[in-house]
Every structure is written in C-alpha cells, then in structure tokens.
UniProtKB/Swiss-Prot annotation:
It is an enzyme of class 2 (transferase). It is found in: Cell inner membrane. CDD domains: PT_UbiA_Cox10 (cd13957). GO terms for molecular function: protoheme IX farnesyltransferase activity. This is Protoheme IX farnesyltransferase. Gene3D superfamilies: UbiA prenyltransferase (1.10.357.140). It catalyses: heme b + (2E,6E)-farnesyl diphosphate + H2O = Fe(II)-heme o + diphosphate. Its EC number is 2.5.1.141. Pathway: Porphyrin-containing compound metabolism; heme O biosynthesis; heme O from protoheme: step 1/1. The keyword Nucleus does not apply. The gene is ctaB. GO terms for biological process: heme O biosynthetic process. Keywords: Cell inner membrane, Cell membrane, Heme biosynthesis, Membrane, Transferase, Transmembrane, Transmembrane helix.
Length: 298
C-alpha cells in the first residue's frame, strides 16, 4: 500500500508528458476558433451534442497533429532553446510511445467526428491533419521559406471545421474566417522567427529571416499585416457582422499595425517578441468580437 502514492505520482507525470506533446496552448487557440465557427454557423442556439462532440473530436485530432510535429522535429527541438525542454528531446517519452499515442488519439477524434458529427467534418479534419503534420511539417518547413504562407492553409481551417460540424456544409462566411487566419499566420510566425533567427539558423531551417535576411522579413511582416487588416474588415462589408465587430477589429488592427510598423522601422527583438504575443491575443479577441456581434448584431 505504501507504494501506491508513488505509483500514482509516476502515472500523473507520464500523463502530463503525453499531454505536453499535444501543445495545449497552441491547440487551445485552434479549438477556440473552431468553437466560434460553430456558434457563427447558425442564428440561434448550437445543438449541445454537436458542440461538445465536435469540440472533442477536433481537439483530439489537433492534439495528434501537434504530437506528430513533435515527433518529426524532436532532433531539431533538442538543439533549439525554445523547444529543448519538450518531452521527446528530454527522453521523457519515446518515439514508439509518441507514435502510438498520436495514432490512438487522432483515430479516436476522427471516429467521433464520423460517427456523431458528419463525414464532411471528419474528412476536412483529416485533410487538415495531413496538411499540417505532413505537408507543412515534413515537406514544406525544411524546404522553403514560404512554408508559413503555404502551410498556413491548414492552420486556418479550424473555424471551417467548426462550421461544418454544425451545418454539414461550407459557406462563404466560413471561408472568410479561413481567410482571416490565413492572412494572420505569416506576421504571427515571422515575428517569432525574427527574434528566434539564430535558433532556426543553427538547425538549418529555411525560415524567412535566415534565407532572406531581417530587413526583407520585417517588410513582409508589415505587408502581410496590411493584408490582414483588409481581410478582417470583410465580415462587416459582406454583412456577416455588424458595428460591434467593426469597431473592435479596427482597434485590434490599429494595434497590430503599430507593432508591424515598429518592427519595420525600429526593430528590436523585444518589439518582435511583443508583436508575437499580441498576435495571439489579437486573434482570440477578434473571434470573441465576432461571437459577441453575432448575438448582438446591429
């Protein structure tokens, strides 16, 4: 009996390591946009069963994709300061264990989506998994500095998945949400790549600051932020959203543009770090504004 507390403690630590493989902070933002997509897809209440099961299914597959990313890049992660503390580089979980875990978790998520949501959502989610974990992580990321731009399509899919989970179809409004995240992805990741340039150079990863230099990357952060600001006004222009969203997004855009201009004109690593952190808050608040406006539209 005296060994029971130790056994439970060891089991808890193991569970925590597998949980860390799913990159919960990253996945939480992904799932949040998917859930908002669910609410925006219908004028009234969202069916509770589809909301819960759709969220669980999408979360599990997103976690599996993150785990596969960790598996593919664990040797690189061991070199980079930002990632060397992850479970695989630390040897806290093995490669076979990670592979088994992601297959089981991802398979369960796809089963839930097919069985209790609809086949369209399951196939779209599987396509998103393949796009992120294989096309982006395995092929594009080590091949081209445009990896973020091309691979951003898979990262922009969650609100479309949420929309399809409730309605069983893809609408033009869902594609607007896709467009917003697609435009958001380059300035978000390039801000990170700027102040982590030495890490990426160390592992030979062709991120834009490594291949084209800081000045070129800073310019593209600004250009893509301008594109993002244009894209985020489209929900209002198409009458998908109203004044609450418009006022909110103009404020959010102004702050993002402020950071992008500072990155371009007066770059420091600290400014890039602040811009990266703000970009996460920005996306969360933008989708929150979409949700509030959806139910209080005027």
């Amino acid at each position: 009996m005296s060994t029971n507390p130790l056994v439970w403690q060891q089991a808890t630590v193991r569970i925590q390591q597998f949980y860390r493989l799913t990159k919960p902070r990253v996945v939480s933002l992904i799932v949040f946009t998917a859930v908002i997509g669910m609410f925006l897809s219908v004028p009234g209440a969202v069916p509770l069963d589809k909301l819960l099961l759709g969220t669980i299914g999408i979360s599990l597959v997103a976690g599996a994709a993150a785990a596969l990313n960790c598996l593919v890049e664990y040797k690189f992660d061991a070199i980079m300061a930002r990632t060397k503390g992850r479970p695989l580089p630390q040897g806290k979980v093995s490669v076979p264990e990670t592979l088994f875990f992601l297959v089981m978790v991802g398979g369960l998520g796809l089963f839930i989506l097919h069985q209790w949501i609809n086949p369209l959502t399951m196939w779209l989610t599987l396509g998103t998994f393949v796009g992120y974990a294989i096309i982006y992580t395995v092929i594009l990321k080590p091949l081209t500095p445009q990896n973020i731009v091309i691979g951003g399509a898979s990262g922009a899919m969650p609100p479309v998945l949420g929309w399809a989970a409730i309605t069983g179809e893809i609408s033009a409004d869902a594609l607007l949400l896709f467009l917003i995240i697609f435009a958001w992805t380059p300035p978000h990741f390039w801000a990170l790549a700027l102040y982590r340039k030495s890490d990426y150079a160390k592992i030979g990863m062709p991120m834009l600051p490594v291949t084209h230099g800081e000045e070129f990357t800073r310019l593209h952060v600004l250009l893509y932020t301008i594109i993002l600001c244009i894209a985020t006004v489209l929900p209002y222009l198409t009458q998908m959203s109203g004044l609450i969203y418009l006022v909110s997004v103009l404020i959010l855009d102004a702050i993002f543009l402020y950071y992008a201009i500072r990155i371009y004109l007066h770059y420091t690593d600290q400014i890039a770090r602040e811009a990266f952190r703000y970009s996460i808050i920005y996306l969360a608040l933008l989708f929150t504004a979409l949700l509030v406006d959806h139910y209080f539209y005027f």
